Amino acid sequence: MQPMPLLLRQSLRSSANFARTSLPIRPQFLPAAGPNIRPARDIQRSFSVCVRCQFRSQSPSYSSPEKDTLKDDAATRQSKDASSTLTPRDESPKVEPDAETQRPSPAAGEQDTLQGFDQDAKNEPKREPAEKKGLPSYLEERRSQLSKQFTEMMDNLQSNIFVAGQRLNDLTGYSAIEALKKDIQLQEERLREARQRVREAKDAYAAAINRRSASQREVNELLQRKHAWSAADLERFTHLYRNDHTNEVAEMETQDALSAAERESEEAAAQLSKSILSRYHEEQVWSDKIRRMSTWGTWGLMGVNVLLFLVFQIAVEPWRRKRLVKGFEEKVIEAIEKEKAINHIEILKPQPALTSTSPSSKEEAAEPTPTSTATKDTPTTDENTPAATDEAITSEPVVWDSDPTPTIVTNITPETATETTEDSAPKSATINLVEPRKPHLSRILPPLPPSTSLDSWRQTLNELFSDRSMVITQRDLTTVTLQSAAAGAAIMGLVIALIRPR
């Protein structure tokens, strides 16, 4: 007896054979007895026996590339399944084509072309339809990540603010006061309910009293006409006499309920008053703590401001002043060097003309009455200061002629080129270019920061309270005024806070 999986496999094979035999068999082409009516096309044969699959593989240009690839994959899977189901036991008819009827396989170049077309179709970007571009989902997909994060942050802004406020309340201790507020609200609701129960108990007690009073009045009326009772009056009297005890018990119960409701209402009112007083006390303590923290915070800010002021006045301002002075000195020195370079160039330009003059011009220049031309900008000489003469000699270029004696030339023009004598060179013809600028620099440059000695600090304090006239801008004056006003207000507030009676 065969197992169940084998029987199922044989049944599936037989059904596949029946399906194969039901398909029409392609007719064979007869041998070529005459000219072919239809030229043979190079068709890329598939290993599938399905005619529809062959048709799909032959016409890839009639449909979109993506659909063709999907259909080809499905056909390939179907052909694989069909080929796997075929076994040597199947006795399906097989058609052996002749050698003449076999068609040649397509060339390798055509296969490469078809594969290139399929690859291009796969790599082609998917085009979005025009009607889809206006949909909200399409716009949502095209939004940037930053925009999405910003939108999410704005959506959660209210909750974030609430959470931040809750954290601040936890830090400052106001959360306990919030809990007291909620407790007070619950107690107020409890007090309202207790008062409502008191009113209901009063109404029930009053109704019980009225009901018992009415019963007693009716009993009294019946007793007054006792000699004339009828059967109905006797039955009524017995009924009222039985209900009198019930009415008395109901009256006592309603009275007890009223007393309990009144006690509960009083307890709720007392608890509410106690909670309100506790909340008031806690809020006072919290406000004192916040006020104390704000006072210390104000003192801390004032200390930071004073510290920054001292740091700027002691460290930053001298450094900035020194840097400005250094930069100004560098610019002045650079300007002086540029002026020296210009004068040097002007002096060296006519030198070839002097060396190429004739002996007659040299004799005329060596006459006992030399003339020296000086410009209006030439400074005066100073014979009493040897240091100034040295600086002048080093700053002024010296022109050497055939005569070994050096001569200092102040200003030489191409028209009048003269030489100074030997006696006027080192002593009387020294030109000082740096000395006239020193008083000017001393007037412009700001004073350097004082040293750390006691005399220097005393001198600085004396200068702070001296009668020296200074130039100040309106901005600096306004800044100093505002700082003084703020400092005065802070000091007065501190004094008032210290001397204020508790």
Curated annotation (Swiss-Prot):
- Which residue stretches does the UniProt record annotate as biased composition, category Basic and acidic residues? 65-80, 88-101, 119-140
**Which compartments is it annotated to reside in?**
Mitochondrion inner membrane
Q: Which residues cross the membrane?
A: 296-316, 479-499
Q: How does this protein lie in the membrane? A: Multi-pass membrane protein
Coiled-coil zones: 139-275
Q: Where is the composition biased (Low complexity)?
A: 367-386
> Could you tell me which residue ranges are on the Mitochondrial matrix side of the membrane?
500-502
Keywords of the record: Coiled coil, Membrane, Mitochondrion, Mitochondrion inner membrane, Transit peptide, Transmembrane, Transmembrane helix
Q: Where is this region: Disordered?
A: 58-140, 350-407
Q: Which residues lie on this side of the membrane: Mitochondrial intermembrane?
A: 317-478
Where the protein is mainly located, per its record?
mitochondrion
Q: Which GO terms describe its biological process?
A: inner mitochondrial membrane organization
What is one GO cellular-component annotation here?
mitochondrial inner membrane
Under the subunit heading, UniProt states: Homooligomer.
Q: Which family does it belong to?
A: Belongs to the SHE9 family.
Q: What does this protein do?
A: Required for the maintenance of the structure of the mitochondrial inner membrane. Involved in mitochondrial morphology. Causes growth arrest when highly overexpressed.
> Could you identify this protein by its name?
Sensitive to high expression protein 9 homolog, mitochondrial
Specify the species. Neosartorya fischeri (strain ATCC 1020 / DSM 3700 / CBS 544.65 / FGSC A1164 / JCM 1740 / NRRL 181 / WB 181) (Aspergillus fischerianus)
